[in-house]
Design a protein with these regions (language model features):
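Active-site-proximal alpha-helical scaffold in enzymes
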Residues: 59, 111-115, 119-161, 195-212
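Conserved active-site "lid/cap" helical segment
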Residues: 1-76, 81-84
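Acyl-CoA/ACP chain-elongation machinery
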Residues: 153-175, 180-191
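Condensing-enzyme catalytic core mediating Claisen C-C bond formation in acyl metabolism
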Residues: 1-19, 183-218
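Short, well-ordered, mixed-charge alpha-helical segments that flank or form enzyme active sites
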Residues: 81-85, 139-140, 165-169
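Glycine-rich beta-alpha junction loops
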Residues: 77-79, 162-166, 209
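Active-site nucleophile and cofactor-binding loops and adjacent substrate-binding regions
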Residues: 12-14, 43-49, 104-112, 129-137, ...
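Active-site-proximal gating segment of KS-fold condensing enzymes and close homologs
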Residues: 77-129
C-alpha cells in the first residue's frame, strides 16, 4: 500500500546493472558460534535467520525431546559462500598463484559449508544434506526432508536455505539478458526481467502430533 520496496539500485562490486535485494547489516554481522572458518556472507545470513522468531530456542527444545542424533539438517543453496572464493582469487599470491591462507574453502565456498555450519551452530548431530539445483534448491530440500521423516531416518529436520549476493550471480544473470533495468515487476504485463536478491530462512519440520504440547503451524 505504501509502495515501498526492498529493492535498491545495484551497488555491489561496481556493478550498476539492475536492482538488488540486499540484506542490511550482513556485512557487519559477526558469527559467534562455530569455527571462524565458517565466516562468510552466506553463513552470516543463515546465522541472522537462526536468531529470528525464536528459532534457535525451538531447535533446542526439539533436541531436548528427541536427542541431537535425531535432528537432521536438509538445506538448499545454489551459491553457498562463493563470494569468499571470488575475493580470494582476486588476492592470489603473484609468485605462487595461491589464494590467501585466510581463505577456508571447505567452510565457505563448499556447498556443504552451510549445512555443517547450521549443525554446529544449533547443536544437532543427525544426518546432513545439501541440495543444490539452482532456484529450486530449497523447495527440493523440503521434499527430501519429508522423505527422511517418513523413512524414520530422523524425528525432526531443520530445513530451508540460504543464498547470498555474489559477482557470479549478478554478472551471470546480466549476461543472459535477464535482469530488469528497474525493480522487477513479476506480475506486470510490461515486466522485463528479474531482480537478484539474497535471503535465508529455516523451519523445524516434525511429524504431526509427535509433540502434542507444541502447536502445529502448518
Amino acid at each position: 500500500k505504501t509502495r515501498q520496496s526492498g529493492l535498491i539500485p545495484c551497488d555491489f562490486f561496481g556493478i550498476t546493472t539492475g536492482y538488488i535485494g540486499r540484506v542490511s547489516g550482513v556485512e557487519n554481522h559477526v558469527i559467534t558460534h562455530g569455527p571462524s572458518a565458517f565466516a562468510c556472507r552466506n553463513n552470516a545470513l543463515a546465522d541472522m535467520a537462526c536468531q529470528q522468531d525464536g528459532f534457535e530456542h525451538a531447535v533446542l527444545d526439539a533436541i531436548t525431546f528427541y536427542g541431537a542424533d535425531r535432528i537432521a539438517v536438509v538445506v538448499g543453496t545454489s551459491t553457498s559462500g562463493i563470494l569468499s572464493a571470488e575475493n580470494a582469487y582476486l588476492d592470489v599470491d603473484a609468485q605462487t598463484g595461491c589464494p590467501p591462507r585466510t581463505f577456508h574453502q571447505s567452510g565457505t565456498q563448499d556447498l556443504f559449508s552451510l549445512t555443517r555450519f547450521l549443525a554446529e551452530r544449533l547443536g544437532t548431530n543427525g544426518p546432513l544434506l545439501t541440495v543444490s539445483n539452482a532456484c529450486a534448491s530449497s523447495s527440493r530440500a523440503f521434499v527430501d526432508a519429508r522423505h527422511w521423516l517418513e523413512a524414520g531416518l530422523c524425528d525432526a529436520v531443520i530445513v530451508g536455505g540460504a543464498d547470498s549476493l555474489c559477482r557470479m550471480t549478478l554478472r551471470g544473470f546480466a549476461s543472459l539478458g535477464l535482469v530488469s533495468d528497474g525493480p522487477t515487476r513479476p506480475c506486470d504485463e510490461a515486466r522485463n526481467g528479474i531482480s537478484v536478491g539474497e535471503a535465508a530462512g529455516f523451519v523445524l519440520l516434525e511429524r504431526e502430533g509427535a509433540r502434542p504440547q507444541v502447536p502445529a503451524l502448518a
